[in-house]
Amino acid sequence: SAGLQMDVFELLTAVFATEDPDFSLAEDWEETRRILGRYPALDRINRTDFLTAVSLLVTSRAGHAAGQREDILNLTLADYLHARRELRTTFLETAEFLSQRCMLTIDQVPYTAQLIPLAVIFARLADTPRALASTKAWDKLNQWFWCGIFGELYGSAAVINRSARDVDQVTAWIEGRTEEVPKTIRDASFSESRFFSVRENSGVYQGIYALLMARGARDWRTSQPFDRWTFPELQPGFHRVFPQEWCRDNGIEDVVADSVLNRTPMGKRTEVVIDGYAPTRYLSRVQTKSLLEDSEFDTVLGTHELNTDLLYQSDFPNFLRDRRSRFLGMVEYAMGKPALRD
């Protein structure tokens, strides 16, 4: 009826039914959903996202990637089946890519929208033997990925055009067909002030949390790395180094106390030991639980991009200043370009 507009999935279902009455797009999607369901990080990939990926892949091979509604509706059943088979594989490769960067659950993925072009880029690069066989190629892919996150370029509603452009430009750049840096990398900029304004629902917040873990941060109590094998046991979160109560008692503004600069990955049982105390008090308690020697414990603390001496002294202003400088370097390295020091 005129009152109920069919979504693109329902329209394509009708299109495919004219080609093959026995084919059910809904049943086919359920099988795709089951395959992607092996990885919690892919939980927000919906059926329209998947059709967008199919369209981007098919059109990019034909000349230029496109993933708008009309592009999806131009797909033939043969186009769909061929691309769907590849994308079921490359979405799993995308989940592995995320896992290696310590993004294991849906809450840890900065932008689900960025996973659509990433899966398509993996499929396109598979057309070229050994396209990802060099460190340089992976460096390029990493740079694009982190620029998308810290530039917050996949956080808006209008990402289809960016996705299409990235599929074409990033693929060509990694394959060495062009020296031109993709527009997403050129567009990306990170302002230092974002350290104080991002909150839990932000891609930058999740990006910094993941980057700390991926760069080797270890749990203070167990000295274990945060990875797919230790996650179920550690149940980590991005917790405050200087607890909220301590910050309030010491006149620290909430905007500073709540910032990512005052957060670090901790296992659930580590965070419990902290219990509102200053580092000067809680560090000895954590170390006792860890059974580590002084030098070993200091090494573990140091994996968190922080100055251990300032932490032991509970010197919050200098701790924050030092960590801001370290975090800035970390973000600039990931993006491959300088940040705005505002």
Where are these predicted regions, by residue range?
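Intrinsically disordered, low-complexity N-proximal targeting/linker segments that flank membranes
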Residues: I149-F238, W246
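Short conserved micro-motifs at the rims of enzyme active sites and ligand-binding pockets
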Residues: R69, P129-R130, L153-Y154, C247-N250, ...
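Histidine-centered nuclease catalytic patch
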Residues: R228-N262, D275
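Duplex nucleic acid-engaging cores and interfaces of nucleic-acid transaction enzymes
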Residues: S1
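Hydrophobic alpha-helical segments
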Residues: I121, L125-T128, W144, G148-G151, ...
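A cross-family structural signal marking well-folded subdomains
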Residues: L4-S193
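Short Cys/His-centered divalent metal-binding micro-motifs
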Residues: S259-T288
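C-terminal, well-folded lobe of enzymatic/effector domains
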Residues: D294-D342
